[in-house]
Amino acid sequence: DSGNIIVTSIDGTSANLEIRKDAHSDFYQWFHFRVSGARGQRITLRITNCGGSAYPGGWDNYKARFSDDREDWRCADTSYEDGVLTITHTPALDSIWFAYFAPFSIERHHDLVQRTAACPDVELIELGQSIEGQPIDCLRIGNGPTQVWLYARQHPGESMAEWWMEGALELLTDPVSETARILREKCTLHIIP
């Protein structure tokens, strides 16, 4: 549900790629794609348009993520030079995934919202829909006077923020956490995961 790459050329075990622009935007930064049929072969993936991305300074010392099962993500050998991000890897299996950061699937997102909304004293409000027709949900937790807004994934490439949000929601809805109890008493939290 979050694939994003353009293959511009393939030569043996090397490929030149480009990151596709975000929908209805001139910006781009994130990628997520699968490579098949390269088990045991050292592959070189060159993303050639990184120099024109939304935040080219973010590629210095950056490491792409890879996974053989889409559950466990590790850092790939990655370098950035002259606007080109180069990923080199030798897959152990026939199918391997690469991503900007560990993806947070839309199914996992919906599960998180549903699980949190089922907790006591949590109100689910649908604020609207995304341009893809997905609900934009807000989870209201607590009843204190201080209004706190937390939101994740404002931009397409920000999947890492929802991993943080998952942990925050687990803490904030924990019935035995003293920290969560105090926050719920002092604040009304409006959370858009």
Show where each model-derived region lies.
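M14 metallocarboxypeptidase catalytic domain recognition
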Residues: 1-193
